[in-house]
């Protein structure tokens, strides 16, 4: 969509961000116990903040552990609420994959609608046509924000096809029967579902009308090897997107900028910082994404450390994330001086189409971290594949990473947020 990638006046954007932020700060001081305490602890008077840059200098980061502690001290919803509890009508919770414990989030109708508007940007940037496209949502009926906001944002604009708890086979048949043109799911599930297309399922590629696959929930949609494999399986264009329960839908991929996520800066004040110093990195450098929510006012977050590792690239006046979300800051493992992220391992593995599933095991050997790659392959595949993968890993990371065959069907399959790295 042309206007999604057109150049914008960054000064005008900053003015709009400050207008929203100024009102937010004053509201939080009066109504939000969590942030009122945080302001006092930092010696910060919201009325004394003189603009976006001043806010960044004075406001400390918000950490996930602070939010967890607040929920534990004031169960079940904590004190991070800007409205009376009776004003909230929507409930979602995090998956708990990064914190070990799900965290509940509540929204008012106004806050919810603000997030739906962000999701509509995702659809518009992917050039979906209202009244024509049919979106198939391959998600179960769960408490996760991504499905509900994506589904409700599409309602009233596109024909929406929910799949609930259907099996993968039933989902493929439903997509073929009703002519779904867009698939919305995680990258892992797009691969898993796509690999069923063919004689075994009775659903051929020719019987499907899918032309676009919108993925979210985990890194993958912007990893070239994962992206190309999904596109080959579906004969469709992949569009990446990312967001999180704590803040909402954050970014979109436009048709004109494949492999790059554009942050919705009208809804978020975004920074990319060095996680050690907290200082903003230069254009073209990598760092941790930090977000301040500007429109989800029922439970806004100020300078929230997302833990997402990204590459900052300014494009046409907008902040974009080159390569999407590259990984998690807390998932990084340092092996022999080399920083390794799970997404980097996946980028290598996905170059080998015979690998059906994989898992990385991390263990201590003589007080040092070591990793090993487990792979599942069809029984008729030569074991020489292990040597090929080991060679590719060595070329990529300049170290030997052992590869071992796992028993067929022994590695977990995932529909939502695949976890392929475990400590043993």
Where are these regions (language model features)?
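Nucleotide 5′-phosphate-binding alpha/beta core
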Residues: 1-125, 367-372, 380-396, 402-415, ...
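Active-site phosphate/ATP/adenylate-binding loop shared across adenylate-forming ligases
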Residues: 2-3, 64-234, 239, 247, ...
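Structured loop/turn residues at beta-strand edges in well-structured enzyme cores
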Residues: 19, 178, 208, 304, ...
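Generic structural signal for residues in well-ordered beta-strands
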Residues: 160, 238, 270, 358-360, ...
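Conserved beta-strand termini and adjacent loop/short-helix elements that scaffold enzyme active sites
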Residues: 163, 241-243, 273, 363, ...
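Extracytoplasmic/secreted proteins and extracellular or luminal domains
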Residues: 176, 204-206, 282, 302, ...
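AMP-binding/adenylate-forming catalytic core of the ANL superfamily
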Residues: 183, 290-399, 416
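Conserved AMP-binding/adenylate-forming
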Residues: 220-222, 226-316, 331
